[in-house]
């Protein structure tokens, strides 16, 4: 390991001890915002410190085995060879693990997120596929122990959704789900197709982190137009008799958010404001990213929602992720919620890109 990296790790261990002390300070405990920020930092530093301690222990084992190789006793030298080999591998493996822990993290990775699914080209078939994507994400969330809450939905008469917005709550949610942003194309034979022809349709998915209140963009109330209306279900029939649904328009940007899933107008308004905050923050982040003109390929899709990231081919039972040239003939499993089959290779590729960028900087 490079001495500069080792020194950086020792600084992080010092900071970990400092944060640990601050968290038990009554002044910190009484300041909820500060306590929350330090708790988050503690969790990240705890992981690094723990692995760094393992590294130092593995280094000690390696040094001991190295000394044993120089022993006068041939039996001792023979025994030391295996220990030396194991210790050398352990040092290399833990060094790799530390390298990944030291990669720059997206500060939003631990946040909850909003997922918007919209039916695109393909009419009813696209809406049905939007419903399939919602089911796939719901099953995946269930496996991960995450909680899903539908914020707004516009059902299609033939089944599925013209659009749906959900909130996903859980640990490390945005860090996983952000790779789902982009265009999702489906190829299959619709139930109404008598000739057995394969049709192509598409949906777009947008994933945005939930913005904590402390970090939220300040929105001027004068910039908002708030409308109330009756919540409606599939086909437009009214499902309640009060104007509990909310539509908020942010006049300067033209961003419109609707929420009608809750019976309470107050709850729908709070949810709509959360989604609006996330959309405005996303627009600001995308503007900053495009100005930076990063040379690194980005596996998280940009604001161009038409950018196709994945194809689901049902006749062949195939799913292809175009960003990393991944093809899997396990479509049924993936649609049933085994999304880790796709997510893990994408996250690994993203880590590899970051490591390559880090190597270039050094």
From Swiss-Prot:
Record-level GO cellular component terms: cytoplasm
Pfam families registered for this protein in UniProt: PCRF, RF-1
Keywords assigned: Cytoplasm, Methylation, Protein biosynthesis
Signal peptide: none
Gene3D superfamilies: 3.30.160.20, 3.30.70.1660, 6.10.140.1950
UniProt-recorded name of the protein: Peptide chain release factor 1
Region listing for Disordered, in residue ranges: 279-305
Location within or outside the cell: Cytoplasm
Changes after translation: Methylated by PrmC. Methylation increases the termination efficiency of RF1.
Species per Swiss-Prot/TrEMBL record: Colwellia psychrerythraea (strain 34H / ATCC BAA-681) (Vibrio psychroerythus)
Keyword Endoplasmic reticulum attached: no
Sequence positions bearing N5-methylglutamine: 237
Gene Ontology molecular function: any one: translation release factor activity, codon specific
Family (UniProt): Belongs to the prokaryotic/mitochondrial release factor family.
Basic and acidic residues composition-biased segments: 282-296
Encoding gene (name): prfA
Function: Peptide chain release factor 1 directs the termination of translation in response to the peptide chain termination codons UAG and UAA.
């Amino acid at each position: 390991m490079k001495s500069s990296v080792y020194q950086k790790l020792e600084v992080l261990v010092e900071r970990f001890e400092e944060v640990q002390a601050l968290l038990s300070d009554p002044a910190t405990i009484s300041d909820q915002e500060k306590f929350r920020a330090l708790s988050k930092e503690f969790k990240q530093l705890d992981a690094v410190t723990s692995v760094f301690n393992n590294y130092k222990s593995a280094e000690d084992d390696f040094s001991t085995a190295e000394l044993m190789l120089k022993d006068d006793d041939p039996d001792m030298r023979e025994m030391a060879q295996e220990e030396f080999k194991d210790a050398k591998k352990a040092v290399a493996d833990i060094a790799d693990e530390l390298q990944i822990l030291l990669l720059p993290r997206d500060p939003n990775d631990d946040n909850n997120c909003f997922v918007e699914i919209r039916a695109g080209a393909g009419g009813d078939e696209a809406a049905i596929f939007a419903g399939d994507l919602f089911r796939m994400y719901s099953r995946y969330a269930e496996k991960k122990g995450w909680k899903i809450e539908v914020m707004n939905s516009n059902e299609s008469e033939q089944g599925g959704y013209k659009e749906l917005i959900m909130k996903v709550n859980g640990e490390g949610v945005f860090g996983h789900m952000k790779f789902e942003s982009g265009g999702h194309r489906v190829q299959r034979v619709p139930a109404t197709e008598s000739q057995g022809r394969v049709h192509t349709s598409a949906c777009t998915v947008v994933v945005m982190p939930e913005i904590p209140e402390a970090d939220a963009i300040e929105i001027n109330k004068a910039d908002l137009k708030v409308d109330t209306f009756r919540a409606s279900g599939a086909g437009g029939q009214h499902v309640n008799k009060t104007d509990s649904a909310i539509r908020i328009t942010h006049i300067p940007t033209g961003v419109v958010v609707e929420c009608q899933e809750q019976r309470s107008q107050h709850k729908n308004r709070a949810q709509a404001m959360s989604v609006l905050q996330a959309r405005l923050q996303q627009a600001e982040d995308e503007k900053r990213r495009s100005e930076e003109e990063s040379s690194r390929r980005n596996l998280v899709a940009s604001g161009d929602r038409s950018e196709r990231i994945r194809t689901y081919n049902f006749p062949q039972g195939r799913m292809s992720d175009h960003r990393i040239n991944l093809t899997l003939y396990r479509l049924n499993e993936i649609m049933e919620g085994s999304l880790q089959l796709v997510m893990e290779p994408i996250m690994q590729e993203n880590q590899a890109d970051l490591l390559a960028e880090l190597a270039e900087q050094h």
